[in-house]
C-alpha cells in the first residue's frame, strides 16, 4: 500500500469504501476499493484472491481495468483505473425535461454490450449491473466496473452501510430463486439500464423482492410454463401470484424508437434460454445507423 497515496473518499460501493488515490511513482490517479468482508477475523478467502487475480486479465476498452490487488492488515484493496463519473450521477444531472441524445443512448448501449460480450466469452458474469457501476468519461466512453466481484465475494443483501442492495436491475430468474443462472442475467440487467438511459427513470423500481416481481409482471405479464418452461417449479414461484396480462413496453418507455423497443423486448424475455445474447443484441437493426468505427473497442490498435 506504500506505493499509493489516498487523496479522498469518493463513495461507498457494495463491498466497502472507495477512495481516489495516486500511484506515488507514476502520478497515475486510481480508484482504491477497500473490500470489507463478512467474516473479517478469518481474513481474505484464498478463493476470492484467486478469482480476483483472474480479473486482472480482463483488459478491454469498455471494462474498468483492475490494475493491482493489495493486502494490508488482512484487508484487501483493489486498485482500478479512475473515472470521475458514473451513469447514475450523470442521469441525475440532466435537467428536467431534457434527455440524453438518442445517438449517445445507442452508443452507450452498444459499448456496454461490447464489454459484456468480452467478459461472457471468458465465462465471467457480472450479476450486479446497475447505473452506479457503469462509469463514463467526457468523450462518450462508458466502462463496466466490478465485473467478476460477485463471484469472488458474493452479493450481500445489504451494503456494509446497511443500505439495501438494489433489486431494480435483477433478472426475473434470480428474483424467482433460480440457482442455475448464467449469462442471460446480465442481458436482462442491460435491458433495464437501456430503458433508464433513455427515460432517466428506472424501468422496474421495486422496494422488496415481491414488489419488484409484481412490477415486472404488471408490465410484461405474469409468466407461466407456457412462456417459460420450468418457471412454475422455481423455488420462489407461487401459484397464487396474480395473473397479469401485461401491457406493451412502449407505454412505459418513451424516447426509444421501434427498433429500440424491439431490442429491449428481446432483452427482457422471461425464459433465459430464449432471451437474446449480448453478441446477438449487437447485430440488431437498432444499431445500423451507429458509427461503430469511432468506438474505443473498434479503434485499430498499433
UniProtKB/Swiss-Prot annotation:
Identification of the protein by name: Cyclin-dependent kinase 1-B
Pfam family, one: Pkinase
Keywords in alphabetical order: ATP-binding, Cell cycle, Cell division, Kinase, Mitosis, Nucleotide-binding, Nucleus, Phosphoprotein, Serine/threonine-protein kinase, Transferase
Keyword Kinase on entry: yes
PANTHER family: CELL DIVISION PROTEIN KINASE, CYCLIN-DEPENDENT KINASE 1
Active-site residues, as the UniProt record annotates them: 128 (proton acceptor)
Subcellular location: Nucleus
One GO BP: cell division
Residues bearing PTM Phosphotyrosine: 15
Positions contributing to ATP binding: 10-18, 33
Biological function: Plays a key role in the control of the eukaryotic cell cycle by modulating the centrosome cycle as well as mitotic onset; promotes G2-M transition via association with multiple interphase cyclins. During G2 and early mitosis, CDC25A/B/C-mediated dephosphorylation activates CDK1/cyclin complexes which phosphorylate several substrates that trigger at least centrosome separation, Golgi dynamics, nuclear envelope breakdown and chromosome condensation.
Signal peptide interval: none
Post-translational modification note: Phosphorylation at Tyr-15 by wee1 and wee2 inhibits the protein kinase activity and acts negative regulator of entry into mitosis (G2 to M transition).
Amino acid at each position: 500500500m506504500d506505493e499509493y497515496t489516498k487523496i479522498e473518499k469518493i463513495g461507498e460501493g457494495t463491498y466497502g469504501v472507495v477512495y481516489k488515490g495516486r500511484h506515488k511513482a507514476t502520478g497515475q490517479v486510481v480508484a482504491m476499493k477497500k473490500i470489507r468482508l463478512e467474516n473479517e477475523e478469518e481474513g481474505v478467502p484464498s478463493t476470492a484472491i484467486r478469482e480476483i487475480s483472474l480479473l486482472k486479465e480482463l483488459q478491454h476498452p469498455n471494462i474498468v481495468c483492475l490494475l493491482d490487488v493489495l493486502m494490508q492488515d488482512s484487508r484487501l484493496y483493489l486498485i482500478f483505473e479512475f473515472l470521475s463519473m458514473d451513469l447514475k450521477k450523470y442521469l441525475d444531472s440532466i435537467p428536467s425535461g431534457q434527455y440524453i441524445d438518442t445517438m449517445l443512448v445507442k452508443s452507450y448501449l452498444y459499448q456496454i454490450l461490447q464489454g459484456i460480450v468480452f467478459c461472457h466469452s471468458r465465462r465471467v458474469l457480472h450479476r450486479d449491473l446497475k447505473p452506479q457501476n457503469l462509469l463514463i468519461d467526457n468523450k462518450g466512453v462508458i466502462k463496466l466496473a466490478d465485473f467478476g466481484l460477485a463471484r469472488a465475494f458474493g452479493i450481500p443483501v445489504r451494503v456494509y452501510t446497511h443500505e439495501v442492495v438494489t433489486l431494480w436491475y435483477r433478472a426475473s430468474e434470480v428474483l424467482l430463486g433460480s440457482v442455475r443462472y448464467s449469462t442471460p442475467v446480465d442481458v436482462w440487467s442491460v435491458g433495464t439500464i437501456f430503458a433508464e438511459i433513455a427515460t432517466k427513470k428506472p424501468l422496474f423500481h421495486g422496494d422488496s423482492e415481491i414488489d419488484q416481481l409484481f412490477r415486472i409482471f404488471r408490465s410484461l405479464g405474469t409468466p407461466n410454463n407456457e412462456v417459460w418452461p420450468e418457471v412454475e417449479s422455481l423455488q420462489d414461484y407461487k401459484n397464487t401470484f396474480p395473473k397479469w396480462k401485461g401491457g406493451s413496453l412502449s407505454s412505459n418507455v418513451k424516447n426509444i424508437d421501434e427498433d429500440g423497443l424491439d431490442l429491449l423486448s428481446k432483452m427482457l424475455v422471461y425464459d433465459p434460454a430464449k432471451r437474446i445474447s449480448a453478441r446477438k443484441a449487437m447485430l440488431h437493426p437498432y444499431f445500423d445507423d451507429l458509427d461503430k468505427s469511432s468506438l474505443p473497442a473498434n479503434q485499430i490498435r498499433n
